[in-house]
């Protein structure tokens, strides 16, 4: 069946989001993953997070009395080039589509900060203490910014606005709300398998979006892009009568005896006697077990103690054991014992 190509792959049963001292940094831990999937998913999510999430940024600035970026402003300690570099670091959040125009006006002495900008609509300054420039006594400055929405990084030469205004200076725009993304892949255990993947993804944002939502958006982008490659109809699921699917015995009987952490001697004796599941074991009597080659009282007592902890004992009668589809049932109920 073609659906086994994806249905029989192990799926993560643990997704944990962790916060750090810095509220803009968070981590997501996903496990277990098939071998190699940690690298595959980690790299794909990282690239999408850094390149494809939308945000807001300043695209151009007009400063009264300034014709180009190589000018200086009387009474302002920074030259225009430094001011533009500071403007590029202003972090914004805006749900509405741009462009929007905002203004800041201030007289010296004092510091012009991002929080001094008169925002419009739902626009929010995320780093209001960020310094734009410093004014001396008697100095005055008025700046008008164009704020737009987009994704990725747009250089200043692509932000040129041909509206006839003199002195409108384009600015490099980093729209992405994601600042840094890193990931690491470690081994993790699931049942008796020790080499599944554990993925830890660490995301640093500018505050416009939290890490959990950012990962969700990136995963949705990947899902939308990859769906184009699925060229077949989803196979119809086989309808199973609920009455037939209900077990008539304890699901713990579907657990394999090699998961009981028995001594090597006891485990080998059970293996040699073709005892695979606990359901096979509990139907054996004590006398039958003692007739097993190399199986003695010490092994018998060990097994009786382990079964007692599970509410089971030797010599039990299970009329419906073994079920016909025992392997499928064991997989279905493995998380219940």
Swiss-Prot record:
Span list, region Alpha C-terminal domain (alpha-CTD): 249-337
Catalytic activity: RNA(n) + a ribonucleoside 5'-triphosphate = RNA(n+1) + diphosphate
Signal peptide as annotated in the record: none
UniProt xrefs under InterPro entries: DNA-dir_RNA_pol_insert, DNA-dir_RNA_pol_RpoA/D/Rpb3, DNA-dir_RpoA, RBP11-like, RNAP_asu_C, RNApol_insert_sf
Annotated region described as Alpha N-terminal domain (alpha-NTD), given as residue ranges: 1-233
Keyword Transmembrane helix found: no
Keywords (A to Z) from UniProt: DNA-directed RNA polymerase, Nucleotidyltransferase, Transcription, Transferase
Annotated GO biological process: DNA-templated transcription
E.C. numbers: 2.7.7.6
Gene Ontology annotations for the cellular component aspect, listed alphabetically: cytoplasm; DNA-directed RNA polymerase complex
Any GO molecular function: protein dimerization activity
Domain of life: Bacteria
The UniProt record lists the keyword tRNA processing: no
Domain notes: The N-terminal domain is essential for RNAP assembly and basal transcription, whereas the C-terminal domain is involved in interaction with transcriptional regulators and with upstream promoter elements.
HAMAP family the UniProt entry points to: RNApol_bact_RpoA (MF_00059)
UniProt record similarity statement: Belongs to the RNA polymerase alpha chain family.
UniProt subunit comment: Homodimer. The RNAP catalytic core consists of 2 alpha, 1 beta, 1 beta' and 1 omega subunit. When a sigma factor is associated with the core the holoenzyme is formed, which can initiate transcription.
Stated role: DNA-dependent RNA polymerase catalyzes the transcription of DNA into RNA using the four ribonucleoside triphosphates as substrates.
Name the record gives this protein: DNA-directed RNA polymerase subunit alpha
Organism per entry: Bartonella quintana (strain Toulouse)
Gene name as annotated: rpoA
């Amino acid at each position: 069946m073609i659906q086994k190509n994806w249905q029989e792959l192990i799926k993560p049963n643990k997704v944990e989001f962790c916060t750090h001292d810095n509220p803009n940094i968070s981590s997501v831990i996903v496990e277990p993953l098939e071998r190699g999937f940690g690298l595959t998913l980690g790299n794909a999510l990282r690239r999408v997070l850094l390149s494809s999430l939308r945000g807001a940024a300043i695209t151009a600035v007009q400063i009264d009395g300034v014709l180009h970026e190589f000018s200086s402003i009387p009474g302002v300690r920074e030259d225009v080039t430094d001011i533009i570099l500071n403007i590029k670091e202003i972090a914004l959040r805006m749900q509405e589509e741009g462009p929007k125009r905002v203004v800041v006006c201030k007289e010296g002495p004092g510091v012009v900060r991002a929080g001094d900008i008169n925002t419009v609509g739902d626009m929010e300054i995320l780093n209001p203490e960020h310094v734009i420039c410093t004014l001396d006594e008697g100095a005055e400055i008025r700046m008008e910014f164009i704020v737009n929405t987009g994704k990725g990084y747009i250089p200043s030469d692509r932000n040129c606005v041909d509206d006839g205004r003199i002195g409108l200076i384009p600015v490099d725009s980093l729209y992405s709300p994601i600042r840094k993304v890193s990931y690491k892949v470690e081994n993790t255990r699931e049942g008796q398998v020790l080499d599944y993947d554990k993925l830890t993804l660490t995301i640093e944002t500018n505050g416009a979006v939290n890490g959990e939502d950012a990962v969700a958006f990136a995963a949705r982008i990947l899902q939308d892009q990859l769906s184009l490659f699925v060229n077949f109809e989803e196979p119809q699921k086989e309808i199973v009568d609920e009455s037939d699917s209900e077990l008539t015995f304890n699901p713990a009987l579907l657990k394999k005896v090699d998961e009981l952490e028995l001594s090597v001697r006891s485990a080998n004796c059970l293996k040699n006697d073709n005892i695979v599941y606990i359901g096979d074991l509990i139907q054996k009597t004590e006398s039958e077990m003692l007739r097993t080659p190399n199986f003695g009282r010490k092994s018998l007592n060990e097994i009786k103690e382990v079964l007692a902890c599970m509410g089971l004992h030797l010599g039990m009668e299970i009329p419906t054991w073994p079920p016909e589809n025992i392997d499928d049932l064991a997989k279905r109920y493995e998380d219940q014992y």
